[in-house]
Amino acid sequence: PLIAQFSDEDLVVGGGVAIFHIASQRVVICSAPDRRGEKYYFLPKGRRDAGEDSRTGAEREGYEESGYRNRLLPLPTKHRQPQAHPRVDSPPLTAEPVWMQMMPLGYGSKQYVLYWYIAETLPPGLEVELETEVGAAYKPPPAYPHSLTLRDRVKMEPEGYEPLHHEGTGVDEEEATYESHLVSVEEAIKKLGRTGVMADVVLKGWKEIQHRFAME
């Protein structure tokens, strides 16, 4: 733990997501060439827009960088946030961040604070509702329904369904070079680097998805 203070002009807040396709037990990772032309892998992330909710910002960045629409997935993760009043006996499922990462931004005193969330790809019906033209303003999806179990969620897709991938969702020249891949959890961890925070986000997300299945 640390104590630190940053003024508004030196602080940038962002969010990232591990986007799971639950039915096929796969997760979305992105890739891009580094300065040496070699491919590296990462989870989609970025700064939230001014006035934007942090969770919505994470979903939007996930969509823009990967091309996969997504929504945060409520899971039985451990966290330190208090429950809303009146409190219930059993802790509810929440979509709280599973990791917080702090990084210097450029040179000087600027600080980047990044929250990592767990999300899922959208069912076919929502993809139709949210369809927009390339370059149009981002349209956020509705939240995951409280009463929808994961098993019933999986049944919303026909067997062998492939989540819809959207082209041209990047908002600048750099993001236009990004490629996305829907891979197994093990392959994602290997490509992200087993000791890095992004691999741990994937691991924790998949563990809690399995935990929720067991609870239901």
Residue ranges and their predicted role:
Residues 23-87:
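Conserved Nudix-box catalytic region and its N-terminal flanking loop in Nudix hydrolases
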Residues 1-7, 94-107, 166-169:
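Short, P/G- and charge-enriched loop/turn segments at secondary-structure junctions
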Residues 1-16, 20:
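Acidic, metal-coordinating catalytic segment for phosphate/diphosphate chemistry
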Residues 36-40, 110, 114-116, 120-216:
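Nudix hydrolase/Nudix homology domain
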Residues 20, 43, 183:
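A conserved hydrophobic position in a structured secondary element of the catalytic/binding core
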Residues 16, 26, 179:
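Conserved beta-strand and immediately adjacent loop positions that scaffold enzyme active sites
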Residues 19-23, 32, 119-121:
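Active-site beta-strand termini and strand-to-loop segments that position acidic
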